[in-house]
């Protein structure tokens, strides 16, 4: 059954989770020497800079969506693999921090609207973070795994990376994550 308060709380939670996640990537890349995201106006918590309109529409239809990827040039890092690892995991860490902040707000504020919005935001942050840990391209878990593998696997990784997109789409549309 349609519930407007749930929809609005979800929209706020999704905007918050996407913004925190993408800002985490942009800020960590900046700290590691890559200002690509900063020059593209993406080092911000403003959801309008991160939300992909089509990804948001698909999210409400299929319960799966996407944000605009933060542009990162790992060639600007002192160590390509370490930098890529840190930037990949930073979005997930951002979602974890977001969930903790929401939990603290829930603990200290006992108003219905705050409980509704920040309760949704907490669970959405946890869900985004957990989902992004899957080791499937283009998710962050894949960035972590590929950064930990020796350089000799790079050709294999890049050759078969597109297979990961297909696996991700098939698994989502078959309902394996439901």
Residue spans for each PLM region:
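Hydrophobic transmembrane alpha-helices and their immediate loop junctions
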Residues: 1-178
